[in-house]
């Protein structure tokens, strides 16, 4: 058991394949030596996951109860899950469609820092309906702090005590939003909408808990496009649209080419395509060549 853990939630066939991207990069860069993975898995996906990932050191598969109403944040509401996670110093809460980079293998988080990714849910909607304006007003109405943090993505790294605090507040705010803030209908992105409520809740919780000095934005959930990877990029998010080199909708539709990279790509999009299209052994060998 390592001192740190990456947590993900697996709930369908697509997330099973997406999990392979996270898993392959975890193995490729020997991140398994410093970070465990715990995959909280719905019963509908447990057979496929255990078939592919059983008896792997530092990887735990936790089957969730069939009656449990699950999401990426409700798993932190279970006493059993909390007890399991309390054994770790740091937690990286992320989604399956995450690609870890070489830089993550040497990353050592600070105890007093909260690391978050970049999100798109705060894009401007209709005139007078800016998402961040509504979030700020709601925080003030709920007597929560607002530090002006915006475009916060779903990725979160922090000391376990901080992660529990943030996810608990996110869970509470999300339930409140769904109950009281959509009286005019469910809405459609990029305007105020129920599908993004969990993202609004996360940004609102971060604004209340994280001061400007404690928050580090941008090293997680980097763009998956033609941008060159830098030493600051710890992970890449597989965005579902508008990406030049790796669009995950096109990947699942079989519309992306199989290139067969002979060396490590320098752009994030090519890196993601290489990971998705290669097996673990190929990637480990490439990492060995890169590091030597």
Model-predicted segments: where are they?
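N-terminal anchoring/stem segment of glycosyltransferases
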Residues: 1-70, 80-88
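Short catalytic/ligand-binding loop motif for oxyanion handling, primarily in non-cytosolic enzymes
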Residues: 14-15, 46-49, 99-103, 124-125, ...
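A structural signal for short, well-ordered beta-strand segments and their strand-loop junctions
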Residues: 38-39, 91-95, 115-117, 213-218
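A conserved donor-nucleotide-binding helix/loop in the catalytic core
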Residues: 62-94, 98-102, 106, 113, ...
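A structure-centric feature marking long, well-folded core domains of fungal metabolic enzymes
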Residues: 75-78, 102, 127-129, 174-177
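Conserved donor-nucleotide/metal-binding helix-loop-beta segment in metal-dependent transferases, i.e.
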Residues: 98-142
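Catalytic core and acceptor-binding pocket of nucleotide-sugar-dependent glycosyltransferases
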Residues: 144-240
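C-terminal catalytic/acceptor-binding lobe
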Residues: 189-194, 208-292
């Amino acid at each position: 058991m390592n001192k740190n853990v990456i947590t993900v939630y697996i709930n369908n066939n697509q997330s099973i394949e997406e999990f392979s991207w996270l898993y392959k990069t975890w193995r490729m860069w020997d991140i398994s030596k410093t970070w465990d993975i715990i995959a909280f898995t719905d019963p509908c996906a447990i057979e496929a996951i255990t078939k592919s990932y059983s008896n792997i050191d530092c990887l735990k598969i936790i089957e969730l109860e069939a009656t449990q109403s699950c999401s990426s944040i409700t798993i932190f509401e279970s006493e059993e899950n909390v007890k399991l996670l309390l054994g770790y110093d740091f937690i990286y809460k992320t989604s399956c469609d995450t690609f870890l980079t070489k830089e993550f293998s040497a990353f050592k988080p600070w105890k007093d820092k909260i690391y978050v990714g970049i999100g798109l849910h705060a894009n401007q909607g209709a005139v007078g309906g800016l998402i961040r304006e509504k979030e700020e007003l709601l925080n003030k109405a709920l007597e929560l702090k607002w530090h002006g943090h915006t475009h916060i993505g779903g990725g979160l790294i922090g000391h376990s005590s901080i992660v529990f605090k943030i996810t608990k507040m996110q869970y509470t705010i999300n339930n409140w939003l769904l109950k009281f803030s959509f009286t005019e209908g469910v809405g459609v992105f990029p305007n105020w909408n129920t599908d993004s409520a969990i993202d609004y809740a996360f940004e609102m919780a971060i604004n209340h808990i994280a001061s400007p000095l404690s928050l580090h934005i941008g090293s997680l959930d980097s763009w998956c496009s033609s941008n060159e990877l830098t030493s600051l990029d710890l992970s890449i998010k597989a965005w579902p649209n508008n990406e030049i080199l790796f669009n995950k909708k096109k990947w699942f539709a079989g519309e992306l080419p199989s290139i067969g990279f002979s060396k490590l790509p320098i752009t994030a999009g090519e890196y993601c395509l290489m990971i998705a299209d290669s097996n673990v052994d190929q990637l480990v060998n490439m990492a060995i060549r890169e590091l030597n």
